Amino acid sequence: MSDVLAELDKVLAQRKNAGDPESSYVAKLHHKGLNKILEKVGEECTETILAAKDAQHDSDTQHLIYETADLWFHSLVMLSHLGLSAEDVLNELARRFDLSGLEEKARRQS
């Protein structure tokens, strides 16, 4: 699974640094700046929430997967724009893996 994320990280970095905004969607987002990227993340988040609600009622899980992929993608573009990667998020998830959710929450509050 993480191989896909690693490859996507590479592509996002390439498009950020050398992509043509006229021919690359990712380069175009980077060119427009963080606010445009955040707008897309928010849009995809809303679409994912709506797809989850629909999936609960009509079992259309494929649409939910599609929208979640869009949300992840645009979140990765956001991370890339800020000099971060999927690996940074995976490392944080790994760090939390052995903690209970309540323990993690307590650590953040102290």
Swiss-Prot record:
Coiled coil region boundaries: none
Keyword Cell division: no
InterPro entries on file: HisE, PRib-ATP_PPHydrolase-like
Domain of life where this protein originates: Bacteria
UniProt-annotated location(s): Cytoplasm
GO molecular function terms noted in the UniProt entry: ATP binding; phosphoribosyl-ATP diphosphatase activity
Enzyme class, UniProt record, top EC level: hydrolase
Keywords: Amino-acid biosynthesis, ATP-binding, Cytoplasm, Histidine biosynthesis, Hydrolase, Nucleotide-binding
E.C. designation(s): 3.6.1.31
GO BP annotations listed: L-histidine biosynthetic process
Chief location bin: cytoplasm
GO cellular component: cytoplasm
Catalytic reaction(s) noted: 1-(5-phospho-beta-D-ribosyl)-ATP + H2O = 1-(5-phospho-beta-D-ribosyl)-5'-AMP + diphosphate + H(+)
Pathway given in the UniProt record: Amino-acid biosynthesis; L-histidine biosynthesis; L-histidine from 5-phospho-alpha-D-ribose 1-diphosphate: step 2/9
Record family assignment: Belongs to the PRA-PH family.
Protein name: Phosphoribosyl-ATP pyrophosphatase
Gene from which the chain derives: hisE
